[in-house]
């Protein structure tokens, strides 16, 4: 019999904090008040739930060139005024980052740049500098020499993220990591990456529009589906504090195929324009195209309009879009989409001072939606004089005097009142 010495496993972790723990009663756990660090960008603070939480691990994903590095560089310059920032880049040199940082704003003395891809070296510098905030750009470029596999591989991304999580919890450092996305729009790397971090943010936008949307899809320290809206300018990202006004400012009065919806993004009401163009089909089957709207939802709405409202759409091409590049995907947009389609089909414009909220059922009924009071108040604040909402949603709410609220039950009733 031969005795064999077993090598110690280097990657074994005791806990998130690196210390041995034992089970505790929930009542015995000490509560703490988390002091969030606010940036100068209120839109960014809102998406995070009120500011940056110490010891949190935040993942930001988005298409290449959409502005992820610009956003984090801008946030870093602001955070360096209240704490020490270490910006680790595996994609650009320190000189390249300096050029961009000078364009974005003042650079504080507590802003450290580090062009490195070795996780051991990054950990060593974190222990030496002891920053309050750490930015990793990007997670796919950082590798640990203790793990087999090339940069960006599943094993490397998983282990480096786990090490960063332990680093954040042990040293109470807020860490932001940039993640690439695939052509399908999901984060590249293992799916468990999103489960490991505290917060997942997506930075979205159309290449041909200057507006960018920062969306929270997971947040352990705040509500999900919150959004922040920015505009990309020569000096960096600028907050859009009144997005409804921006999305509606180019709307033409008297144009057919247009309607306004009050949609909710997280806890925030936003008014957006839905446009429809319905034209006779020239060849074979009717064509359906959507931009910023769900294709299946649009097809369902057109089927309901044909069956319940008597619109002959089977031989009509339909082109639908949300103006301004914003994506609308909640059920409450159904009524506005239906009205826009009917407006184009009938070639009759809607009243520019009217807006619409409601989910459309297959039998033609208008179903209740959430946060109806917030939606009505937002429409009134922006000067709209009339809003169509589900009648069942009006129970127990206080209606503002500045706007006429019309409760409706069916799509036939809505079209009769709008196009009378």
From Swiss-Prot:
The middle region has homology to RecA with ATPase motifs including the RadA KNRFG motif, while the C-terminus is homologous to Lon protease. Unlike most bacteria many S.pneumoniae do not have the N-terminal putative zinc-finger. It comes from Streptococcus pneumoniae (strain ATCC BAA-255 / R6). This is DNA repair protein RadA. PANTHER family: DNA REPAIR PROTEIN RADA, DNA REPAIR PROTEIN RADA-LIKE PROTEIN. SMART domains: AAA. Residues 317-420 are annotated as: Lon-protease-like. Belongs to the RecA family. RadA subfamily. The gene is radA. It is an enzyme of class 3 (hydrolase).
């Amino acid at each position: 019999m031969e005795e064999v010495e077993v090598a110690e496993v280097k990657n074994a972790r005791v806990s998130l904090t690196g210390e041995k723990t034992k089970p505790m009663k929930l009542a015995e756990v000490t509560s703490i008040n988390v002091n969030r660090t606010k940036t100068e960008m209120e839109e960014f603070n809102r998406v995070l739930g009120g500011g940056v939480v110490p010891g949190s691990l935040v993942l930001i994903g988005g298409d290449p060139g959409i502005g992820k590095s610009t956003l984090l560089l801008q946030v870093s310059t602001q955070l360096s005024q209240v704490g020490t920032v270490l910006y680790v880049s595996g994609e650009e040199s320190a000189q390249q980052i300096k050029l961009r940082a000078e364009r974005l704003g003042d650079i504080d003395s507590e802003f450290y740049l580090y062009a490195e891809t070795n996780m051991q070296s990054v950990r060593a510098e974190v222990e030496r500098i002891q920053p309050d905030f750490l930015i990793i750009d990007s997670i796919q470029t950082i590798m640990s020499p203790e793990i087999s596999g090339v940069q960006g591989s599943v094993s490397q991304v998983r282990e480096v993220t786990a090490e960063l999580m332990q680093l954040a919890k042990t040293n109470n450092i807020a860490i932001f990591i940039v993640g690439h996305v695939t052509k399908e729009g999901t984060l590249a790397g293992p799916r468990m990456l999103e489960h490991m971090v505290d917060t997942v943010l997506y930075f979205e936008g159309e290449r041909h529009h200057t507006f960018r949307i920062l969306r929270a899809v997971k947040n352990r320290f705040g509500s999900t589906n919150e959004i922040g809206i920015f505009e990309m300018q020569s000096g960096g990202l600028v907050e859009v504090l009144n997005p409804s006004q921006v999305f509606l400012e180019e709307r033409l009065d008297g144009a057919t195929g247009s309607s306004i919806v009050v949609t909710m993004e997280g806890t925030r009401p936003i008014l957006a324009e839905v446009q429809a163009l319905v034209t006779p089909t020239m060849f074979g089957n009717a064509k359906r195209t959507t931009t910023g709207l769900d294709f299946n939802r649009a097809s369902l709405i057109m089927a309901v309009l044909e069956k319940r409202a008597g619109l002959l759409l089977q031989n009509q091409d339909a082109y639908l879009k949300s103006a301004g590049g914003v994506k609308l995907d909640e059920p409450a947009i159904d009524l506005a989409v239906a009205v826009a389609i009917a407006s184009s089909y009938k070639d009759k414009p809607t009243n520019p001072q009217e807006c619409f909220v409601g989910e459309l059922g297959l039998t033609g009924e208008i179903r209740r939606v959430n946060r109806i009071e917030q939606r009505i108040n937002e429409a009134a604040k922006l000067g709209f004089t009339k809003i169509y909402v589900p009648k069942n949603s009006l129970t127990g709410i206080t209606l503002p005097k500045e706007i006429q609220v019309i409760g409706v039950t069916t799509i036939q009733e809505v079209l009769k009142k709008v196009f009378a």
